[in-house]
C-alpha cells in the first residue's frame, strides 16, 4: 500500500510540472529529486531520522503529494540507527530506479559509473514511457537496509549473463521478496530466486555493493524492467 501511494505521487508530479519526472537522487542533495538525504548507520548523520528530507518541498518533490513521512517506511524494515544508546527507525525504505530522470551512470555493463552514458534510454518525461511501455518499467522498490543511501537505486543492464553485476541490493524482508512499483501505477511483490540477491541485513554499512553476480536471474529480471537501448 505504501508503494502504491508513492507511485501515485510519481504519476501526479508530471501532471503539475510540464510532464517532467522527478530525479531519483544520487547525492542526497540533488535538486529535483523525489526525496532528499543520505541514509547510513552513522549516529551523527541527521538524514537518518530527519523527516524534513521527505516533507519539505524544497528537498523532496514528492512532498506536496504525501503529507505523512510514514509512507516512505516499509513496516517490514526493522533497520535502525543507535543514537545516545537508543534505537531509532530510519525514515525511508525505498529507492527509485536511476533510469527515472537519470543520469543512469550505472546502467551500462561494466564495473564503473559512466556519467555520460548514451547507450541506454533515460526517462525524463512521462511521455517517454511509450517505449517499452509503462507497465514494463519499474520505478520504486524496497531496498536492502544495508544498501540504501541516497534516493536512487542503481542496477545494471545485462548484455552477457555471465558478466552480470549487482550494484545496489533489493530488500528481501517479505519472506524473500520485495515490493516493487511500475510506471503505469501498479505494484507487485517480487520473490527473489538467487541467494546472492538476499544477504541477511546486518544493520551496518558492511554490505559490499557493485559486485559480480554472474547468471543471477534476479539481476536479469530487474534489468529487463529498467530501460531499453536508445534507438537514435
Model features per residue range: what roles?
Residues 3-232:
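Short, well-structured segments within or immediately adjacent to enzyme catalytic domains
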Amino acid at each position: 500500500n505504501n508503494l502504491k501511494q508513492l507511485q501515485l505521487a510519481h504519476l501526479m508530479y508530471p501532471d503539475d510540472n510540464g510532464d517532467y519526472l522527478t530525479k531519483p537522487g544520487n547525492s542526497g542533495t540533488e535538486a529535483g529529486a523525489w526525496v532528499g538525504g543520505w541514509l547510513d548507520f552513522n549516529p551523527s548523520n541527521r538524514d537518518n531520522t530527519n523527516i524534513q528530507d521527505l516533507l519539505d518541498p524544497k528537498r523532496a518533490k514528492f512532498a506536496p503529494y504525501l503529507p505523512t513521512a510514514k509512507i516512505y517506511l516499509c513496516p517490514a524494515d526493522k533497520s535502525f540507527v543507535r543514537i545516545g544508546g537508543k534505537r531509532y527507525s530510519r525514515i525511508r525504505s525505498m529507492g527509485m530506479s536511476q533510469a527515472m530522470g537519470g543520469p543512469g551512470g550505472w546502467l551500462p555493463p561494466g564495473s564503473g559509473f559512466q556519467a555520460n552514458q548514451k547507450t541506454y534510454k533515460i526517462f525524463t518525461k512521462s511521455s517517454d514511457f511509450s517505449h517499452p511501455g509503462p507497465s514494463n518499467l519499474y520505478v520504486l522498490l524496497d531496498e536492502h537496509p544495508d544498501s540504501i543511501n541516497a534516493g536512487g537505486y542503481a542496477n545494471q543492464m545485462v548484455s552477457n549473463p555471465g558478466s552480470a553485476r549487482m550494484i545496489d541490493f533489493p530488500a528481501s524482508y517479505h519472506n524473500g521478496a520485495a515490493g516493487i512499483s511500475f510506471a503505469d501505477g501498479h505494484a507487485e511483490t517480487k520473490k527473489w530466486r538467487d541467494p546472492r540477491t538476499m544477504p541477511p541485513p546486518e544493520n551496518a554499512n558492511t554490505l559490499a555493493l557493485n559486485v559480480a553476480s554472474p547468471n543471477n536471474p534476479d539481476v536479469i529480471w530487474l534489468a529487463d524492467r529498467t530501460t531499453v537501448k536508445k534507438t537514435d
